[in-house]
Amino acid sequence: MKKAKLIFKDNTPFSLDFDDFYFNSKDGLNESKFVYTHSFEWKNQENFIITESGFGIGLNFFLTLKRFLETTPSKRPKKLFYISVEAFYIEKEQLREIYQKLRFYEEFKELLEHFLKFYPKAKEGIYRFYFEDCFLDLVFEDITILKELDFKADVWYLDGFSPNKNSQMFDENLIFEVARLSKKNTQICTFSSASFLQKNLKKYGFRVEKTKGFRKREMIKAYLENELEFKDKEAYFSRTFSSLKNKKVAIIGAGISSAVLAYELSLRGFKIDVFEKHLELGKGASGNESGILSSLILKSKVKLGEFSELSFIEASRFYRQILDLNFKGVVEFAHNDLMQERFDTQRENVLFKISKNQAFLEEGGVIFPKNLVKNLFEKSKACIYFNHEFQAYKFENECFTLKFKNDIVKSDYAVLIYAMGADTKDFVFYDEMKLSKVRGQVTHLKPFLDTQFPLSSKAYICPIKDDLQVIGASYDRLDASLESKEEDDKQNIENIAEFIDKNTKLEIIGSKVGFRSYSSDRFMIVGNAYDEAFYKEEYKALLWTKDKEQKPAKMSCNLYFNFAHGSRGFSTSVLAARYLCALINNEPLCLEKKYIHAIHPARFLVRKLKKGL
């Protein structure tokens, strides 16, 4: 990612990249309020979306958030979504220094320090920050990333230096995307009154009004008169907006994917009931005593690897923001030539500090799955029903009725979510969706290696916890045994041989078996359940029509999937939960289209149809 070249000129931040000030050198605070943050009215609605082109030092965001929090809740939206795109990275310490030099620091100190605490490294991606009743999605990408995003903004801040020095931020391509991502009466706020900007806005349906700008300047405001119609060539992957009879949600399964989702849903005011077939938490794969938060390291520009990296960093930031966890890092080792090739292509990746055959992932570390899941459920205030083995559902009058073993029935749920991990294989039967149930066994040893970092190679070693040390894990697609096996413990020990002296005596004090859920392409399966018969009929000619407009997809109403997280559920569950909340609650989708397509439940069928099969 490009780093901003920034100096101070007239006591104001000045960009050497664009030969322009970040804002008015005389009275930047009041100009920002006048042009952007105080130039529109709040609407008393569920979600309010503001999108900004050019985050800069974040002044517009902090002013907006301050205004939002100071407004009486009954006179503002319930949730503020603020999406800001920035292509030039400013270092954390430099941001703090800028606020101090401008004498803004004390005014924004609390909000700014919270922001800086979770500020990411200089790497492209979408990074979420949690504030009171507000989500900030900071998008570190070029502005062309808008074509990959999906939301309907209420207000746009078109910022980003003078149009004659940064024309890309105001050109026709950008304004088309702005119009696509807007709804009727969406307001455009901008300091500019450039004629070519006015022309582009009018071309895509905005009503443009000239108005007096800050002090002597002239500026424009614009309003979308009618929502833009455009041809969707990939409608089979597009969202369908949800309509809910109530805010009751049922989640089947009580592992990590369920726990993160329950927490995220609780932030949106949903009442969550969780149904678990076991008698307590921690009986499945999410119940290990210790585990590792880490990322796959694949060759650069491999989509699965890029998604794993984003999932990992966002999970780390989520656990730090929500559970106040601290991570000391994890060390990954290249244990064969293929792994070494992968490491060699990632030497410039800021997530991986690579030296020879080692990679240090600073944002990773040891996790304690059992406690983590328990804490998230407690925060969500979800009601967990143990000893409830799910069997079937009915959907009538816009609500689900659930049937469980022993003739137990629960009803009146507007949303049903499958998050039962490896057990999903027994409930989902799409023709092209191939699911695997993979057995894994971890071994509990008497402490034998004093390490503050988890070590991961052929197998992994966790730091000591409560007089035991966890190593693992075995991997067997063909074994369905629930009992621990001596040969698996032996294999786990053999796989950590590179970390210990051959004369070290290891004492086994226990083992634990769990089952992972995998898809055939290793991406998780997250999103709406779909109408298979509709897809097969409507999209049967995709081989010949894939470059033409497609009819909107038909989904199974308010039934959602959240499974196939494999062995990295503690990473992938965070993005999965946010994405599902966005679908359920009609929020901005927090993922790029390429990743939405990669995790979509219908992707396997669509691939087959595109081949004419």
UniProtKB/Swiss-Prot annotation:
Keyword Oxidoreductase in the entry? The reply is yes
Stated EC number for the protein is 2.1.1.61, 1.5.-.-
What the entry lists under Pfam families is as follows: DAO (PF01266), Methyltransf_30 (PF05430)
Which BP terms from GO are recorded?
Answer: methylation; tRNA processing
Presence of keyword Methyltransferase: yes
| Region tRNA (mnm(5)s(2)U34)-methyltransferase, residue ranges | 1-225
Entries under InterPro entries matching the protein: FAD-dep_OxRdtase, FAD/NAD-bd_sf, MnmC-like_methylTransf, SAM-dependent_MTases_sf, tRNA_MAMT_biosynth_bifunc_MnmC, tRNA_MNMC2, tRNA_S-uridine_synth_MnmC_C
- The lineage's top-level taxon is Bacteria
**Protein task:** Catalyzes the last two steps in the biosynthesis of 5-methylaminomethyl-2-thiouridine (mnm(5)s(2)U) at the wobble position (U34) in tRNA. Catalyzes the FAD-dependent demodification of cmnm(5)s(2)U34 to nm(5)s(2)U34, followed by the transfer of a methyl group from S-adenosyl-L-methionine to nm(5)s(2)U34, to form mnm(5)s(2)U34.
Q: Which PANTHER family match?
A: SARCOSINE DEHYDROGENASE-RELATED (PTHR13847), TRNA 5-METHYLAMINOMETHYL-2-THIOURIDINE BIOSYNTHESIS BIFUNCTIONAL PROTEIN MNMC (PTHR13847:SF283)
The entry assigns this protein to a family as follows: In the N-terminal section; belongs to the methyltransferase superfamily. tRNA (mnm(5)s(2)U34)-methyltransferase family. In the C-terminal section; belongs to the DAO family.
For this protein, the record's HAMAP family field holds: MnmC
What's the protein name? tRNA 5-methylaminomethyl-2-thiouridine biosynthesis bifunctional protein MnmC
